[in-house]
Amino acid sequence: MPTKVSLSDSDLFSSQQVASEADQTSKFEERLNPLGRILEIEGYHVWCCSPIYGPDGRVHVFYSRWKNEYKFSGWVSACEVAHAVADSPEGPYQDLGVVLKGRGGDAWDSWAIHNPTIQNVGDRYALFYMGSDGSSLDIEQSDLPSLSDKAYERYYTALV
């Protein structure tokens, strides 16, 4: 049977109390050192790296990438997932190329694959991602880079 819980005003945090706690730096955060970018691929925007150690002891990174011609907002219309590998998390990484791209047609992920997350499940790997489908739009995917930002906005909104 569910337990009923009641809270009094004294049990709740005030917004001032929450804000002051949020301003404090945690011990974990104090130990972080920025390294800069660890993965750059010429001609592409790179986003959302999902690293995992493989059975070979190397770091495998699955990441989103899309051509610079699609501008930064092109993630929703022309993104693919690629794979890179390194001996340590800090790199350097060797790009192994695309592992998954939009399937075309009217599939839910016909145009773009984005935000990969790789997980080890027993002796297999599962790659989770989001996708976008532009098959019902009144434009070809290859025509998007030539649009002005203002003209592109309506397609971006439809895909998001």
Can you describe what each PLM-predicted range is?
Residues M1-C48, I52-W111, Q119-V160:
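Beta-rich carbohydrate-recognition and catalytic domains
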